[in-house]
Amino acid sequence: MFLLYEYDIFWAFLIISSLIPILAFFVSGVLAPINKGPEKLSSYESGIEPMGNAWLQFRIRYYMFALVFVVFDVETVFLYPWAMSFDVLGISVFVEALIFVLILIVGLVYAWRKGALEWS
């Protein structure tokens, strides 16, 4: 039977952890001074005069390459706990991790075939 009161601590944590950033943004928006001027709108380059225009267009290739990198970086985060507890968990978890890696390899092959990993 599903008992809702067992999750009271979870819901309290979720509500409080959501309200703290919202409250912080609200308070900073109310208390912050509003000074708009040319210096406020100029780009900042480590304390020196900006060189060139700050608004540059990036090629979509860089975005796709970064997106593929993030996906496989997150894969590493998911596989690390599995690797650390491999001897305790057994063969069933090994099969699950293998399926996870195979799905990601299929995604990598798909991205490779679509040209997301090519620079030219």
Curated annotation (Swiss-Prot):
It is a multi-pass membrane protein. It is found in: Plastid, Chloroplast thylakoid membrane. One of its GO terms (molecular function) is NADH dehydrogenase (ubiquinone) activity. Its EC number is 7.1.1.-. Keywords: Chloroplast, Membrane, NAD, NADP, Plastid, Plastoquinone, Quinone, Thylakoid, Translocase, Transmembrane, Transmembrane helix, Transport. GO terms for biological process: photosynthesis, light reaction. The keyword Nucleotide-binding does not apply. InterPro entries: NAD(P)H_OxRDtase_bac/plastid, NADH_UbQ/plastoQ_OxRdtase_su3, NDAH_ubi_oxred_su3_sf. Belongs to the complex I subunit 3 family. This is NAD(P)H-quinone oxidoreductase subunit 3, chloroplastic. The lineage of its organism: Eukaryota, Viridiplantae, Streptophyta, Embryophyta, Tracheophyta.
